[in-house]
Curated annotation (Swiss-Prot):
A zinc finger (CR-type) spans 124-200. It comes from Aquifex aeolicus (strain VF5). The keyword Repeat applies. This is Chaperone protein DnaJ 1. One of its GO terms (molecular function) is ATP binding. Keywords: Chaperone, Cytoplasm, DNA replication, Metal-binding, Repeat, Stress response, Zinc, Zinc-finger. Zn(2+) 2 binds at residues 154, 157, 174, 177. Homodimer. Participates actively in the response to hyperosmotic and heat shock by preventing the aggregation of stress-denatured proteins and by disaggregating proteins, also in an autonomous, DnaK-independent fashion. Unfolded proteins bind initially to DnaJ; upon interaction with the DnaJ-bound protein, DnaK hydrolyzes its bound ATP, resulting in the formation of a stable complex. GrpE releases ADP from DnaK; ATP binding to DnaK triggers the release of the substrate protein, thus completing the reaction cycle. CXXCXGXG motif repeats lie at residues 137-144, 154-161, 174-181, 188-195.
Length: 364
């Protein structure tokens, strides 16, 4: 599941047509609230980073224009690349890393939904999944250049990799060389000099028995590639149970409908019923079972850590649609003997009451 496009205007609390002065004013106000030296709350540090993210995007005309285009199209893919760079230089600003070697940093986590059948989630399985992940470019092996690197000193920052600007004179990574201090003359044509590409990745994930809807499975170090030699991020899979053609899961129980014939409902007998394992079991139906009755089969429901729920069968009585003449006569004879008081059973060709009613309508 991809990173959503953040609304930096909302984060700073300004309108989308806000001037630079309005952006600076909103930024100063929020910094006084969330700066780590002022606010000791651990959550304030993350909020402070996000505020700086928003400010350093919106205060720069070129960067703001690029962001506005991404936001208007809700282009999650473009924003992922954009966010990676923004977070990198904001962190370097906050940490005061000017002129220092970049330290290894863990890659971004990946969060996505994992659709599972009831069988896969309930009984457990090894599930193969394919997803997109940032990896080293296979052509340049993560170097970002084609062949031997040909570089020139960045004219914008004179090789410093940083330029001082902004209301607090913060050193910011140079937007021309992306903070490197040099410009590669022969960037890799596959990754455009980034050293990494988004590639399809295939893994097998263990699904434990009794996995529930909404449960999140963590797969360590299967997220995006790390930065500067750092570890990859983690992969988080949120379980979504698919609709089942037979069973409906309610808590730990499985519910299903079973159609039985009228004679079996009256006389009793056994029917074949499927289980989650794909087997069939014999279930006894009591004589005189009515439509809508339920039959509970213990411990044949959804698995969980210490056992299993029940299988609850909702009985429906099937009504035959096409009867032969002999079958109809037998049923008519039976109906006469077991019908309730006040009932008039239609015979073939209509009942006496029906014929008299039709005659009166013709003479009216």
């Amino acid at each position: 599941m991809s990173q959503a496009v953040k609304d930096y205007y909302e984060i700073l609390g300004v309108n989308r047509d806000a001037t630079k002065e309005e952006i600076k004013k909103a930024y100063r106000k929020l910094v006084r609230i969330y700066h780590p030296d002022i606010n000791p709350d651990p959550s304030a540090q993350e909020k402070f980073k996000e505020i700086n993210e928003a400010y350093h995007v919106l205060i720069d005309d070129e960067r703001r224009s690029e962001y506005d285009a991404i936001l208007s199209r809700n282009d999650v893919g473009k924003f992922r690349d954009f966010l990676e760079y923004i977070q990198e230089f904001v962190e370097s600003i906050i940490q005061g890393e000017k002129g220092k070697k970049r330290r290894p940093r863990k890659g971004q986590d990946i969060k996505m939904k994992l659709p599972l059948t009831l069988e896969e989630a309930g009984l457990g399985c090894e599930k193969e999944i394919i997803y997109s992940r940032w990896m080293d470019c296979p052509v340049c092996e993560g170097m970002g250049v084609k062949g031997e690197a040909e570089t020139v000193v960045c004219h914008a920052c004179n090789g410093e990799g940083r330029r001082v600007s902004g209301i607090f004179n913060f050193p910011r990574p140079c937007s021309v060389c992306k903070g490197k201090g040099f410009i590669v003359k022969n960037p890799c044509p596959t990754c455009y000099g980034r050293g990494r590409v988004s590639a399809q990745h295939k893994i097998k994930v263990h699904i434990p028995p009794g996995t529930e809807e909404g449960e999140v499975l963590k797969v360590p170090e299967k997220g995006h590639l790390g930065y500067f030699g750092g570890k990859p991020g983690d992969l988080y899979l949120k379980v979504v149970l698919k609709e089942h053609p037979i069973f409906k899961k309610v808590g730990k129980d499985l519910h299903m409908e079973k159609v039985v014939s009228f004679p079996l409902a009256v006389l009793g007998g056994t029917v074949k019923v499927p289980t989650l394992e794909g087997e069939e079991i014999d279930v006894f139906i009591q004589p005189g079972t009515e439509c809508g009755a339920t039959k509970v089969v213990k411990e044949k429901g959804y698995p969980y850590e210490n056992g299993r729920g029940d299988l609850i069968i909702h009985i429906r009585i099937g009504v035959p649609k096409n009867l032969s003449k002999s079958e109809r006569k037998l049923l008519e004879k039976l109906a006469e003997s077991i019908k309730e008081e006040g009932e008039e059973v239609y015979r073939e060709g209509g009942s006496l009451v029906e014929k008299l009613s039709s005659l009166f309508k013709k003479n009216a």
